[in-house]
Amino acid sequence: MSKASNHKLDIDNLDFKRIYTFEEFELINEQLKTHTLKIDGNPVNLFEFNEGKLLPMPQNPISKEAVACEISRQLCNWNVHTRQNGIITASQGGFDFDISGQRTIRATDVAFIPKNIYRSLDHQQQWTFRGQSFTPTFVVEVAVVQEGNREFNDLDKKFREIYFATGSSVGLGWLVDPKNKQIYIYRRRVTGVVYRTLHGWNNVDGDSILPGFILKVQKIDDTISQESSESSSSESDETIDCPKCNATFSNDYDFMEHYEDSHARKWHKGE
């Protein structure tokens, strides 16, 4: 039994000034799966980890999480349709960014890991944080911010010093503010310098990191709009014939699901 297992941790009275071991960090996050803390009135079920310090991650309000899910949805569709066969993670998908040899666990709102990185991972890397560190190539944070305020400065520092740290594979990052309708794009110059550009609220492409991917901001607006909308996938008298096989369908949704599963989502051995 590990030393951390023998050490009684009072989840409700954590000391955020002390240095925790990595084993204690893992134990705390494991206990938080069935326990919720409140810090400054905000519910917390997950911590990040930086040089022994616990960094609370408050739960996302519904609109922020909905935006992150919509970005993930568009990214997942691109991943399937272009047969990238990579991995997309959401807001509890943590990575060890290994800053200056220090274990640094950060969870981005959305991340993409190419298939060549994922397929090279060993068992420990896949199922624990104890293997050799690896990072995604693309990260997204969703937040309501104002340039110059504390949260914006903290996120800007997170992009520059954590996500784009020396040795990180991250080549593209987006800070998405759906309320103020701004997207901040982070890239790394060939010199290694990280720079930020303001993109406004326009469709944005994935550069060479996500070839062919375009984030459509209107779909984000539609997702969090409180105006009513109706699905057009109801059954009708007309049938839809699949152009690649003999299957027929009575609604758009079933046809699209069939087309993706049977024709678009073909993962070939050896890819």
Give the residues covered by each predicted segment.
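Gly/Pro/Ser/Thr-rich low-complexity, intrinsically disordered segments predominantly at protein N-termini
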Residues: 1-248, 252-271
